[in-house]
Amino acid sequence: MVSPESNPEPTKMAAFLQFVAVSAVAGIVAAGLAIPGVGVATASANSAVEIFNALPATLEERDLGEKSTMLAADGSKIADFYWQNRVEVPLDEISQEMQDATIAVEDYRFFEHGGIDLEGIARAAVHNMVSSTTQGGSTLTQQYVKNVLAENAHAESNREGVEAARESEGTAGYARKLREAKLAVAVEKKYDKKEILNRYLNINNYSGSPNVYGVQAAAYRYWGIDAKDLNIQQSAMLAGIVQNPSAFNPERFPDAVLERRNVVLGQMLKYGHITQKEYDEAVKTGLDLNIKETPNGCSAAENSAAFFCNYVVNVIKNDESFGKTVEDRIATLQRGGLTIKTSLNPDIQKIADKEVKKRVPVGDPSGAGHALVTIEPGTGEVIAMAQNREYTEGEVEKKDKNKKTNINYTVDKKHNGGAGFQVGSTWKPFVLATWLKSGKSLNASVNATKRNFPASSWKYSGCPNMAGDWDPSNAGDGSGKGSMTVLNATKNSVNTGYAAMGNQLNMCKIMETAMDLGIRYGSGEKLDFADKSGFIQALSPSSILGTTETTPIAMAAAFATFANDGEFCGPKPILEIKDRNGKNIDVPGEECKQVLDKDVARGVAYALTQTFKGGTTSGLGIGVPAGAKTGTTNFEVGHTWLLGFTKTLSTAVWTGDPRGTRDWRKNGKGKVSGQIYGATISGKTWQAFMSKAVKETKGNTGFPKPSSKYFQGGGSGGGGSSSTGTNRGGGGGNGGGGGDRGNGGGGGNGGGGGNGGGGNGGDGGGDNGGGGDEAPGLGGN
């Protein structure tokens, strides 16, 4: 609007509009609304009517901002999300006392006028012309219009529009009043009185700060009850707040609110809504507040599910069905009144949270991260998600770096995670699946002797060649076992055996298998993504031993495929979404699909069940049939894993440095404390968690045995030579992604392209299993 300094007309216009307002008594506004029996006498009045008639006659009413609620699978609440804390309810769920109190104090002639109360306008206009104080004169319908206009501006982040909707001074104030009057009449024609009253009670601000909108949210905030249960004095208090929510905030100004409440009680008595006895009893009472919080967002998530909550929020933020932009999607969550039922199992989540924090406590001086995620085979439903940090949505102070984070260690960057972690020997099942897909057997023999694999020996058909000479080693740089079966190489996680297997396969096919099983880099890029130098990590020979960086949730979903006869189901954290009207909204996610032949999946599952029988997961049994794989990168990289599954649960457990690389053989004072393998920390957590979690599920039967063709003997050791590595290209010299210490696991010293990455150690437990006991935590004193 043009300011008075730049335009001399506003003073005249203000006077004119004031005249229009006062002239309503004489019928000018009424005439403009074609109210029978009212005439127009003057040219000025005619002009006023013309201006009035030119005002907008249709009120745009959007859905009110209403809080959304996230639920666990059993219907228990995880968190609320809101821009305005509001829950809309129909009029029959609002007490009659609340309806009466509102009408008595705000518009006692509500059921008599048609949206504009000429008597009220006249009274207010005359008062305002002769007094230094002002009266409003607005009907309840006009107030509703004002709130709708402000709400619309809020939804558009239009601050000027909000101010304009509430302007009360000068020309702008009179213009607003006229606009409201015109629109109020339109509203009265559109709705009956009860509908208008219902909408009014749902849109009002009943606090100021914290924001409480609508009578249902207000009833819960101040007394922990529903709007239908509000009594006389409670209703009077709420009705009195509306005049000035900030000044009449019960939590900040109880004395002023009590005085205002009693004024409302007087109005209720005056207009016959309560008896003298009811009035006398009500004014003697206090406010008797029983404040109930409605936490907003994932920080206050229940069931220790803050990181899962944040994951679900990011699933919504990434889905265009909730809005064109991220901002639109956030608005849908905070204003849409959604009910989001998730896959989280609260009982299993509690077990996960307890076991993760027991093994590596929050604030452990080592700074080690420890995380777990569980997926249901056959559905992809995310059952539990935990890590040894407190969730925060703000910046983390340096002193709290080992205690708090806003990063979810189990997911990718797209879902507020990190860049992922090297997975070590948990990558080997992808090599094994490719081996079986190519028609080879679990009983085929491979040459596990430590040796160099020249760049020229690697096979690439259909993708870029990333090979370099490679000289992988086993745990402790020990010698290989010579000829061994693929089953034994898997059972004991022998790096050199798997290098020989990979050397016989098309590296492109290994990468394709991993991609079919849902594996991406933690950055979110596909596995065939090339960096600035053109290097593709997932095609490097060292990737056979796990130098690829991905996420625990992706690995859990991939391993679930082995338990589910080759059918892959991507992570699915949301079961159902309903809008404010109870209508179903499409749930983000893809359908499950068959990505491996059933027999191939069964072959991999069978091999992984054998790791419990004298292999790298010996001593980690959980009392039901299970398959598992340990994983350890080289100590300088510092990530250890346990991936394992039953027919009902697939769980990934990770331990490592979330901020970079760290040698976990050293404690906080730099002293060597011993080797850390996948079975040492991650394995213990997996065992403790799964042994309890499987009791919460049904159907943990054994796995179907694969076809006999996968148990036929034969095969050869494949390429390689005794020459030393050349540190060339992606293959690296002395490389590997780590191995598993069992009967010959381990890794090399480098890999990953040059001298980096790779593995120098493994996962262990060996034949006697378990990796030994350890005190909770990894740090120093």
Label each PLM-derived region with a short phrase.
Residues 57-67, 72, 135-143, 148-174, ...:
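Extracytoplasmic/periplasmic proteins that interact with beta-lactams or build/remodel peptidoglycan
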Residues 64-275, 491-495, 502-506, 518-520:
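Peptidoglycan glycan-strand catalytic modules in the bacterial/periplasmic cell-wall system
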Residues 104, 139-146, 197-200, 229, ...:
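Structural recognition of the beta-strand scaffold that forms the well-ordered cores
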Residues 104-117, 130-136, 187-193, 205-211, ...:
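Bacterial peptidoglycan biogenesis and beta-lactam-recognition machinery
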